[in-house]
Amino acid sequence: MTNKHHKSKKQEPAGPERILPKPNAKIRVNILYDDGHVLALDKPVGLPTQPGRGHIDDTLVNAAFATHGEALSKLGADRDWGLLHRLDMDVGGVVLMGLTDIGYDSVRAQFEDRTIAKKYLAIAHNAPPADTGRCTRELAEVIRGDMKVSVHVPRGGEEAQTRWKVLSKSKTHCLLEVEPLTGRLHQIRAHLAMVGCPIVGERVYRAELPPNTSRAPAGRSQEPLLLQAWEIEFRCVAGTRQRVRSKLGIDMLQFATQQRWQIPV
C-alpha cells in the first residue's frame, strides 16, 4: 500500500558534463591524429576543454562533436564523451579523446599506470638550479579565494613529480621542456614556481601576487600563460607507440623569436 504522505525524492538535474554535448562547427580545431579509435586535437589557448559552468556549447568537446559526434555519443557520459584528459583554459596543445570503447579504455589504462609520456613547453622567469632536474614536493589541493590551487604540505600531500630540461635560456628567462610524471592540479605551474621559475603570464603561483585570486592586480595587464601541452606519446590499439606534437603557439613563438632561441618543432 502506498503511503500518501510519502514524497518521492526529487531527482537532481544532471551537471553539464553529464548532458550530451551539442556539436559546434563554428569552433575550428586542428586534428593532429585520428586512427578511428583515438583522436588527438590541438586545443587553442582560451578554449575550455569541456562543458561546465558558463561554457555549455563553446568548448573543445563541442568542436569534436561537430566532426566525430556519432562515435563520441556512443561512448556516453560514463566515458566522459570520449575525453581522456583536460587542459586548463589558458593552456593550449594536445588533447586525446577516445572514439571507440577499446580506444578509450586502452588509453585510459595507460594514463592510470603512467605509461603515457607527456611533455610540455614552458617559458619561465629566471632559470632552474640545474639544466636538468626534478621537483618531487608533495602537493595538496586547497581553496584560496575564488579558486582551487595546489600547495606544498610537509605531511598528507599527494605524490607529485615533475622533470625539467632547459632547452634555451637568457639572463632573465628560460625555455623548458617539462614532463609531469604524475597528474596533480596545476602541477607544472606549482612546481616550477617552487624552484624559482614561475611561468611567464602566471597569475596564481607568483610570490609577488595575491595568493587568493586568479585575476591580475589592478594596473597589470593579463599576459598569456606561456605553457603548452607540446607532445603526447601513447600505445595505439594496434600496439605501436604513437607520438603526437602540436605546433608552438603564437605567443610562445613570438617570445622565443625575440630571445633568438632555437624553435622546437
Walk through the language-model features, giving the residues of each.
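Short coil/loop residues immediately preceding or within conserved phosphate-binding loops
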Residues: 26, 78, 159-161, 173-175, ...
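Long C-terminal interaction/binding lobes of large macromolecular proteins
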Residues: 164
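PP2C/PPM family metal-dependent serine/threonine protein phosphatase catalytic domain
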Residues: 155-160, 204-208
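RNA pseudouridine synthases
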Residues: 1-148, 155, 169-171, 241, ...
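Residues that recognize and position ribonucleotide moieties
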Residues: 85, 132-133, 157, 186, ...
